């Protein structure tokens, strides 16, 4: 199969807002690829915006200057995948030049449509509305299977592409079960506006836990073998010896647990998230980092113990099993209550300890691997900033034809200009998209038919964010975490926008 077929399908999927049409287009492509398991795996990964190789060391810098496109499609899907694998294996002296040469060779053989697809895929910008449920439905349609069967296999296998390859080759998906050593998708939380809201949504009584601002880890132990996975299912065992040692100290043979790795100060207050995140880098000197930035691990759920799966067990039963196994120093603080005052006090104490909020877990909730359910709710304070829109990108998928992803700038009193601190396309309603498309045309600087439209720095926008982290991507050295639009501020002049110092104060 040619890369051209995948690129055209991606364009078609991005061009329609109809879920049924998206599913049908992807299913048709997968049906053509079946029963070739390698081909199916690659296509599902790519159209989900991911690479089977996960990381290949190619960033935007390597994609800035591209050769002219090829006149006719000739690249095959498997051939491109092989090239990407080769790029990902390069390391050491001269590898950057080799990587650049292979990228140039690949793009010179790609047509304009194929270049666009590869550019967005490698840059992490393939927003076409085909992730998650839509892709699972497409796999189910192509394989002639119930969507729930595909979703469960993907959930327990931790990989929709693997489930798709099995289903489209005629293999039974009921063989996908929780297996020690094979990561599964983590359960995710919805948001509650307050502890009172969480109590109401959980029927009056719930279990509150401290929400640590660390890194989610999934811990697998089979006898004396331990594997540690991130929330994106990357294996980081070698980078986290402290987590391995804490797991081996538990009186258990086989284990699958959910937890948080976090760097703490000497007084047990959390370090900035960036300190914890630095321990997960692929090139980190583990011994040196451990000496200067040691990690602690806190377990908060247990999914399997010594031959017994606990996914279907209620929260209370899983926590009882956790408490019987893990010492208190390795568990998060917890409160079971129906009293809003007690819940509010617990939240206040958690925030005072330096943590980011609380989780509320319904006592009867099952562990919904890979899904965002109401059984878990997160409650945390929200920071807001008034920033200036510096540029905007054209949308894709449902937002095709709309100016969508906005570039955000903080005011720099020293220069009188603005410093970019992030981007976001989150939180925008349809009405807001319509309004800003018109508004940004009015304040555009230069042409508006390119991917990025530059703007006069006149429009103030209020954004909510979860915090700030260090970043070399932006000139201010900082980036917003999980920024989303609250509203546009017609009542505010750019001179009233928050300064870069206000952003730094949140770090």
Curated annotation (Swiss-Prot):
ATP binds at residues 209, 216, 231, 260, 300, 372, 378. It catalyses: ATP + (deoxyribonucleotide)n-3'-hydroxyl + 5'-phospho-(deoxyribonucleotide)m = (deoxyribonucleotide)n+m + AMP + diphosphate. The active site is at residue 211. Its cofactor is Mg(2+). InterPro entries: ATP-dep_DNA_ligase (IPR050191), DNA_ligae_ATP-dep_bac/arc (IPR022865), DNA_ligase_ATP-dep (IPR000977), DNA_ligase_ATP-dep_C (IPR012309), DNA_ligase_ATP-dep_cent (IPR012310), DNA_ligase_ATP-dep_CS (IPR016059), DNA_ligase_ATP-dep_N (IPR012308), DNA_ligase_N_sf (IPR036599). Keywords: ATP-binding, Cell cycle, Cell division, DNA damage, DNA recombination, DNA repair, DNA replication, Ligase, Magnesium, Metal-binding, Nucleotide-binding. One of its GO terms (molecular function) is metal ion binding. Its EC number is 6.5.1.1. CDD domains: Adenylation_DNA_ligase_Arch_LigB, OBF_DNA_ligase_Arch_LigB. Residues 1-172 are annotated as: Not required for adenylyltransferase activity, required for nick joining. The keyword Transport does not apply. GO terms for biological process: cell division; DNA biosynthetic process; DNA recombination; DNA repair; DNA replication. Pfam families: DNA_ligase_A_C, DNA_ligase_A_M, DNA_ligase_A_N. It is an enzyme of class 6 (ligase). Belongs to the ATP-dependent DNA ligase family. DNA ligase that seals nicks in double-stranded DNA during DNA replication, DNA recombination and DNA repair. This is DNA ligase B. It comes from Mycobacterium tuberculosis (strain CDC 1551 / Oshkosh). The lineage of its organism: Bacteria, Bacillati, Actinomycetota, Actinomycetes, Mycobacteriales.
């Amino acid at each position: 199969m040619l890369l051209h077929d995948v690129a055209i399908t991606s364009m078609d999927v991005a061009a329609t807002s109809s879920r049924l049409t998206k599913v049908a287009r992807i299913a048709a492509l997968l049906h053509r690829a079946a029963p070739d398991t390698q081909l199916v795996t690659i296509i599902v990964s790519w159209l989900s915006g991911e690479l089977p190789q996960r990381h290949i060391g190619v960033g935007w810098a390597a994609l800035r200057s591209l050769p002219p496109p090829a006149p006719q499609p000739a690249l095959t899907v498997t051939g491109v995948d092989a090239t990407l694998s080769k790029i990902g294996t390069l390391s050491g002296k001269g590898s950057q030049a080799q990587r650049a040469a292979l990228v140039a060779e690949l793009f010179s053989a790609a047509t304009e449509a194929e270049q666009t697809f590869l550019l967005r895929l490698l840059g992490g910008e393939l927003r076409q509305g085909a992730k998650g449920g839509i892709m699972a439905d497409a796999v189910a349609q192509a394989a002639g299977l119930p969507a729930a069967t595909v979703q469960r296999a993907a959930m327990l296998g931790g990989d929709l592409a693997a489930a798709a390859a099995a289903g489209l080759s005629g293999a039974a998906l009921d063989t996908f079960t929780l297996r020690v050593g094979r990561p599964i998708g983590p359960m995710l939380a919805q948001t509650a506006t307050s502890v009172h809201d969480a109590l109401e949504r959980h029927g009056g009584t719930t279990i509150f836990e401290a929400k640590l601002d660390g890194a989610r880890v999934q811990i697998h132990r089979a006898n004396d073998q331990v594997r540690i996975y991130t929330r994106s299912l990357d294996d980081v065992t070698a980078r986290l010896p402290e987590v391995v040692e804490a797991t081996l100290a538990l009186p258990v043979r086989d284990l699958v647990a959910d937890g948080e790795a976090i760097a703490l100060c000497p007084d047990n207050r959390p370090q900035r998230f960036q300190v914890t995140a630095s321990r997960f880098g692929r090139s980190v000197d583990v011994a040196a980092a451990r000496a200067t930035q040691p990690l602690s691990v806190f377990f908060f759920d247990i999914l399997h113990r010594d031959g017994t799966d606990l996914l279907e067990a209620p929260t209370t039963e899983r926590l009882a099993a956790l408490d019987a196994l893990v010492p208190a120093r390795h568990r998060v603080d917890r409160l079971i209550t129906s009293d809003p005052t007690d819940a509010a006090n617990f939240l206040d104490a958690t925030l005072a300890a330096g943590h980011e909020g609380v989780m509320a877990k319904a006592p009867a909730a099952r562990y919904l691997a890979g899904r965002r359910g109401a059984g878990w709710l997160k409650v945390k304070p929200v920071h807001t900033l008034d920033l200036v829109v510096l540029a905007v990108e054209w949308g894709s998928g449902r937002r095709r034809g709309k100016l969508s992803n906005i570039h955000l700038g903080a005011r720099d009193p020293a220069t009188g200009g603005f410093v970019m601190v992030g981007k976001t396309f989150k939180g925008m309603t349809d009405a807001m998209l319509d309004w800003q498309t018109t508004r940004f045309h009015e304040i555009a600087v230069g042409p508006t038919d390119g991917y990025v439209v530059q703007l006069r720095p006149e429009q103030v926008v209020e954004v909510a964010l979860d915090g700030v982290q260090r970043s070399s991507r932006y000139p201010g050295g900082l980036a917003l975490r999980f920024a989303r639009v609250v509203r546009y501020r017609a009542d505010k002049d750019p001179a009233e926008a928050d300064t870069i110092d206000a952003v730094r104060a949140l770090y």
